[in-house]
């Protein structure tokens, strides 16, 4: 992703210009240094910079981290914090959203901002000079990001405007397209993008790979109950040999677990780079609301979610922070005890915890922790769901048991905690394989 980070500041120069020597008729001339959609995108580097602008929108904490749109809408999480803090998030958590809600506008606006940027890259590529293979890779990544945005839009809102080309201002009054048209566009974009390179053939983390494309395409097919097509898409991911379940579930959510063998698509964050911070505040939003913990306490996991785990499941301690858990404190050599202060559920989220030793020199609104958008475990479980729908239960159980085996072999001691208040001890058979009986 080095190239993407180094170019991101160039995107912001597209709205600026320099005026050279003055003359009487300079106002009637187009300044040669002005970048517009007409004179930009002339070569592969400029088209790549346009793609960077598309990726830049993924950093929005309101959309692609999807805890606001997905977690809070489920029984797995409560808004958290206190009722007077971010009341609009409480409306989401309790299904009281209104069209006038700021957050509804944020989601809608950010998704369509991605789509607009992708449309421009795709449309302007026709006039780009350079290696056609490189141009196609840029275009196909933009198509994936456009499909990803429409996937969230149609899943959240149903009928939405379908915009698949760059629009002029006078064209911006649009009707809502039927859901079927949106799904058709998503499928079309993803099928075009399946020719993208695999993980092994990209030399930059964060790129869209064929595995990421097939994973989202399989999820789309599953949503639409196209089970044969679902199986074909997920089989492409599994048979590629590019992904595997890492032995330690907790490792995935630590800094060293970023872009690991289980990561299918991951949104990259980076801080302290020459062009500025490209970090995230999602972790600050969700870490415990406590001075010693340094978070704001939103997105608290619920008792309902805890009850979904089987006794002794090691994943519990990598999902929940419990009252009484002890962590290393900000001052080296000291500790503090989490109280889950103002958590309406009595718990906090563990996956977003950042050790104090990794926060040194970082702005609390700009942490360099990636968003694990799609993991191989999710692919396997979605694949199993599709196989089950086609009465291929033996194959489905095999995939489910792969995930269960990894879970039961995960260490029961969290290396980033001093101690955990939750008792994981269990004398029965831990997470046994699912069988036909």
PLM features: what roles do these ranges have?
Residues 48-52, 56-61, 84-157, 180-181, ...:
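Conserved, well-structured interaction surfaces
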Residues 326-365, 399:
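Surface-exposed, extracytoplasmic segments of Gram-negative outer-membrane nutrient-acquisition systems
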Residues 182, 412-437:
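Surface-exposed intrinsically disordered loops and tails
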Residues 19-21:
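C-terminal motif of bacterial Sec signal peptides marking the signal peptidase cleavage site
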Residues 159-179:
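Short coil/linker segments at helix-helix boundaries
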Residues 2-12:
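Bacterial N-terminal signal peptides that target proteins for export
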Residues 32-36, 96, 164-171, 418-422:
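Short linear capping/connector segments at secondary-structure termini
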Residues 23-86, 183, 191-192, 197, ...:
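An aromatic- and glycine-enriched ligand-binding surface/loop that stacks and positions planar moieties
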